[in-house]
């Protein structure tokens, strides 16, 4: 293992027994901004990362500003990772039209299936931007890395 790379383990949030040896950062999924801020106000020893946040399924990416505002106020807040970045789908030839189309989930008549649950990115599977990307671009563009 490369000792120079930070280690991330989201499970430390659920079990603090090994937090000093198992993870170099505090990490949670989908923590509301208020919970993130409570951690950051309490003299944290480790930076905070949202390993998943802003799940973009349907029209659900709203609320990004609340998280981005924390970047301006807390140095130990490192931001987060949007789930998902790109839809997960496959190009297949449509049996009726003969055209290449994107299919996912229940499109293959497989069971069990989460149907469109793999279609939750800020880009379509063909890398075409979705409207939610406009909000991400707007707020991310206001912050330096």
PLM regions: where:
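Surface beta-strand/loop "capping" patches
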Residues: 126-145
């Amino acid at each position: 293992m490369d000792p120079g790379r930070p280690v991330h383990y989201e499970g430390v949030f659920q079990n603090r027994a090994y937090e000093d040896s198992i993870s170099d950062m505090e990490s949670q999924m989908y923590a509301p901004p208020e919970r993130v801020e409570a951690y950051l106000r309490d003299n944290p020893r480790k930076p905070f990362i949202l390993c998943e946040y802003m799940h973009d399924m349907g029209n659900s990416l709203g609320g990004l500003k609340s998280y981005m505002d924390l970047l301006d106020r807390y140095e130990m807040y490192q931001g987060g990772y949007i789930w998902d970045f790109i839809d997960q789908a496959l190009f297949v030839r449509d049996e009726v039209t003969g055209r290449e189309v994107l299919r996912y989930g229940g499109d293959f008549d497989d069971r069990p299936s989460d149907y469109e649950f793999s279609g939750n990115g800020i880009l379509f599977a063909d890398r075409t931007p979705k409207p939610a990307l406009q909000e991400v671009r707007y707020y991310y563009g206001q912050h330096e890395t």
